[in-house]
């Protein structure tokens, strides 16, 4: 409003804006993704693969081994930049003797990064990354290869579900920058 040289919003208009911000309305949901969780996960995987992502469904104990195997199958270096994320710290990376991990933000020389995802969207096969101290956004953008760890429980039907989860985790007035 300031850039338009308009005064402060007042009266009913201000009340309407405040009410909408206090209780954001939920947008429309896509019917194809309103499924039981196992089918949501399958739909997410189908869409992700359609969009040329490589998907491997493994148990939590097998994540480090699968990451190492993926790198070997694709002739990628076993040196990875990893997000300093509590999600990723829960895995036994030390069991992978050939894997060299540097934790922190992405750098121009990084060829491979490993991060956790905030959510996966079943209706589109999209991963949602929430930037912050435990997930530097540079890890999403700089390396040529980005390995994303997504828990099945974090796959949601659609974008509207992600907005709700973001508000739950970060609060209404503090969202991740990216």
Where are the regions that the model predicts?
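The feature marks the mature, well-folded catalytic cores of soluble enzymes
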Residues: 1-178
């Amino acid at each position: 409003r300031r850039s338009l040289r308009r005064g402060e919003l007042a009266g009913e208009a201000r009340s309407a804006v405040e009410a909408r911000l206090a209780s954001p309305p939920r947008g429309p949901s896509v019917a194809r993704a309103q499924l039981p969780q196992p089918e949501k996960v399958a739909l997410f995987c189908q869409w992700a693969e359609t969009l040329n992502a490589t998907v491997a469904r493994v148990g939590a104990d097998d994540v480090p081994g699968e990451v190492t195997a993926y790198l070997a199958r694709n002739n990628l270096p076993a040196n990875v930049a990893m997000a300093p994320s509590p999600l990723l710290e829960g895995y036994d990376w030390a069991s992978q003797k050939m894997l060299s991990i540097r934790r922190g933000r992405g750098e121009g020389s990084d060829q491979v990064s490993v991060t956790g995802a905030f959510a996966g969207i079943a209706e589109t096969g999209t991963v949602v990354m929430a930037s912050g101290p435990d997930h530097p956004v540079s890890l999403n953008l700089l390396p040529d290869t980005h390995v994303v760890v997504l828990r099945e429980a974090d796959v949601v039907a659609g974008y509207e579900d992600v907005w709700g989860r973001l508000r739950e985790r970060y609060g209404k007035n503090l969202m991740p920058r990216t």
